[in-house]
From Swiss-Prot:
Forms a cylinder of 14 subunits composed of two heptameric rings stacked back-to-back. Interacts with the co-chaperonin GroES. GO terms for molecular function: ATP binding; ATP-dependent protein folding chaperone; isomerase activity; unfolded protein binding. This is Chaperonin GroEL. Its EC number is 5.6.1.7. Together with its co-chaperonin GroES, plays an essential role in assisting protein folding. The GroEL-GroES system forms a nano-cage that allows encapsulation of the non-native substrate proteins and provides a physical environment optimized to promote and accelerate protein folding. One of its GO terms (biological process) is protein refolding. It comes from Ruminiclostridium cellulolyticum (strain ATCC 35319 / DSM 5812 / JCM 6584 / H10) (Clostridium cellulolyticum). Its main location: cytoplasm. It catalyses: ATP + H2O + a folded polypeptide = ADP + phosphate + an unfolded polypeptide. The gene is groEL. The lineage of its organism: Bacteria, Bacillati, Bacillota, Clostridia, Eubacteriales.
Amino acid sequence: MAKEIKFGEEARRSLEKGVNQLADTVKVTLGPKGRNVVLDKKFGSPLITNDGVTIAKEVELEDKFENMGAQLVKEVATKTNDVAGDGTTTATLLAQAIIREGMKNVAAGANPMILKKGLQKAVDTAVAGIKENSRKVKGKEDIARVATISANEELIGTLIADAMEKVTNDGVITVEESKTMGTNLEVVEGMQFDRGYLSAYMVTDTDKMEAVLDDPYILITDKKLTNIQDLLPILEEIVKQGKKLLIIAEDIEGEALTTLILNKLRGTFVCVAVKAPGFGDRRKAMLQDIAILTGGEVITEELGLDLKETQITQLGKARQVIVQKENTIIVDGNGSAEDIKSRINSIKTQIEDTTSDFDREKLQERLAKLSGGVAVIQVGAATETEMKEKKLRIEDALAATRAAVEEGIVAGGGTAFINVIPEVAKLLESTSGDEKTGVQIILRALEEPVRQIAENAGLEGSVIVEKIKTSEKGMGFDALNEKYIDMIEGGIVDPAKVTRSALQNAVSVAAMVLTTESVVADKPEPEAPAVPAGMPGGMGGMY
């Protein structure tokens, strides 16, 4: 296919045009007084959002060369979202500012490769400054502040702080759509997996249709149970003690299942059977998780363990087990804290090593089940459109709080960028020529988030930037209430990881755009000539 090629200034200008179209669409959402963007959907109602990456993903431009610029900046947003989960609008805005200032200098004759060196030096200094200025998250209040700023709503901040407190930092917090108007939090303590009882005859509470076992033994095996003789020795031992039993096995059917149900109906003893969760190797790993959590062993022939010879000491124990039609919850397992901690560390290592998103998600689920439980935030709203918008904000806020716990918090509202300007400015003494120009470009770009937040609030950005520059470190502008305050004291904070990632990713892509000398794209194919109206198709008019 024939290609169209643009060179030099013309190529860079086309890319810049695309960058500006995408960035101008996204940056109106920044800050407490930022607006929303409406995205058209082929099916269903339009999506209204202020999430940078969601907007960026929808932008596709008609001009091939301009579209390349837009796609490059889209990468800034998606990469920042992948690393930090928030800060996508800031990253896009920074990329635009660096490209804009850089283009002016390249057009004036600056060497892009030397400029790039200056950009990188300045960013490394700025990132070091951001890390130095950050402070650790101290308790629930800080988490609530981060989430409130990210979601732009206090209720959401409080909900997320409650959820993080209940399930710890390693716990899983999921966001679901609620059937009601309100937004609320539901916490499942202990380990939950998606397998329920094998027979409705096993329930102990017929009103709720669930089986509740207090202080039961737990038999964990990867075998398929059909013969009751395999189970008899251990069952007799449990009946003697007057205890209840939960069996987790690959499957239970035939004589084994019938005998268990009959004994339950006769009142001899209470036993509930469920299938093992997961499939293949993941099933083995999950059974091992359950065994460690409950202080038992997985009875498997792979380890030379025979079901007939199972001892009572090989069974797990828990304070309570609740078995529903489709879920089983093990509360307060009897496993040793040391073993559980060691297992958690092992899963964390696997999460770091895996390259598959699916595997990472499944490993994080296992980690959550072992470490604290699962919290579900149920999002409710008057209309579906509002619910989707709210859900996106909550997901962003969740990612921001996790990032804050990881690397700490810095002053929000763009103040963290201005606070590192003095450090970056010191580089002007040790650099010269185009490298020095690269440092100056970053110095200008660091002001951009504050300018944009102010402009979105209908104020003059330059005045506010100068005022913050001459104020003490940590002092910033509260755009919601239009006053200068100590940002951290006032609860306006951003995660250091989000701030750092936004800057690093913006420079990475901006440097690529500035060092571009030619752009190649497919030539648009000429449209086929339209068939004149009124002509008969084929020989249709003849007899």
